[in-house]
């Protein structure tokens, strides 16, 4: 397998705490000034703070403040944002360190954890997986199976297979990550990149956190979960599906999973660098017009105006960038 495993979603609740800033500093080890304040929430919380795919929900309904505490929810983008901006570097990878902190802390529970396994070696074929599901060649206690096929005119544009119900505590999703991530004008859109995501909620999420903290080998843990949850088999005349032979391609994939490691901090651009790219793409032509029409002095005036209007969050982003890359002021 050419890619390692990644944690692609993490949600946890810190009970007996009401201050979101305390949670951001104590658990995420991030500058709370990076986060924007929102007058909306989710999961029964009325307010939130937000930064790059990380949502911190707080202020639950009256009477449940300590019971519900503060909830942190990080999407896949949020997990990468956390890796980029956190100061939490103990115990190897930042996410591993955060998971260990969740595990050892009182009144802290993981409510969702997604583990993503990527296949770039052509071990998994989405059409073959979908055909196996449709023909009943899946040995699993999970009864709900769903297949989605998308088309671009008459051409197939993607297949997604779900094993498990949307609201269940455990669900597996197979999909084409390259087609999700890239535009069809990008040559990488056509590469083989099939992702298997294991979505764990409730006790399954808490159990996975404990297992990660008590295991030095994430690959073996992931392969053990897969072996327990499902297998693709070759049906024969035997009515007992558990006695059917497991498909070689699935055995090869699970064996490959056993060898993967949790990916270390992904090489993703800092949010400030993405702002620079936006300036180049969207603003540079207008700046060149101003320069030709009025000269550089007007541009300096615009820059000074921007400095005066800089928000607390923007200043925090600059400070974070300087800390990450050890940039000195000139």
What are the roles of these predicted feature ranges?
Residues 273:
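Catalytic phosphate/metal-binding cores of nucleic-acid and nucleotide-processing enzymes, i.e., regions
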Residues 1-270, 278-330:
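Structured, helix-rich domain cores that form ligand/interaction pockets
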């Amino acid at each position: 397998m050419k890619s390692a495993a990644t944690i692609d979603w993490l949600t946890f609740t810190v009970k007996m705490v009401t201050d979101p800033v305390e949670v951001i500093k104590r658990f995420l080890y991030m500058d709370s000034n990076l986060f924007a304040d929102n007058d909306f929430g989710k999961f029964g919380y009325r307010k939130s703070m937000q930064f790059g795919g990380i949502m911190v929900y707080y202020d639950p309904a009256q009477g449940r403040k300590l019971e519900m505490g503060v909830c942190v929810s990080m999407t896949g983008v949020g997990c990468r944002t956390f890796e980029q901006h956190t100061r939490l570097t103990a115990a190897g990878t930042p996410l591993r360190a955060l998971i260990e902190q969740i595990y050892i802390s009182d009144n802290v529970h993981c409510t969702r954890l997604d583990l993503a396994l990527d296949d770039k070696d052509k071990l998994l074929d989405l059409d073959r997986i979908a055909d196996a599901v449709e023909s009943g060649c899946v040995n699993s206690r999970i009864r709900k199976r769903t297949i989605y096929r998308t088309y671009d005119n008459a051409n197939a544009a993607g297949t997604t297979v779900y094993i498990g119900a949307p609201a269940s505590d455990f669900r597996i999703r197979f999909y084409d990550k390259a087609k999700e991530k890239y535009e069809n004008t990008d040559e990488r859109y056509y590469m083989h990149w099939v992702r298997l995501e294991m979505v764990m909620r409730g006790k399954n999420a808490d159990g996975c956190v404990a297992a990660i903290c008590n295991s030095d080998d994430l690959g073996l843990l992931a392969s053990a979960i897969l072996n327990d949850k499902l297998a693709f088999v070759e049906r024969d005349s035997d009515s007992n599906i558990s006695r059917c032979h497991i498909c070689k391609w699935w055995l090869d994939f699970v064996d490959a999973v056993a060898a993967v490691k949790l990916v270390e901090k992904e090489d993703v651009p800092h949010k400030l660098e993405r702002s620079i790219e936006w300036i180049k793409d969207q603003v540079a032509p207008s700046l060149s017009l101003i320069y030709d029409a009025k000269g550089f002095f007007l541009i300096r005036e615009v820059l000074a105006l921007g400095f005066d209007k800089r928000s607390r969050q923007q200043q925090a982003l600059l400070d974070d960038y300087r800390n990450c890359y050890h940039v000195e002021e000139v």
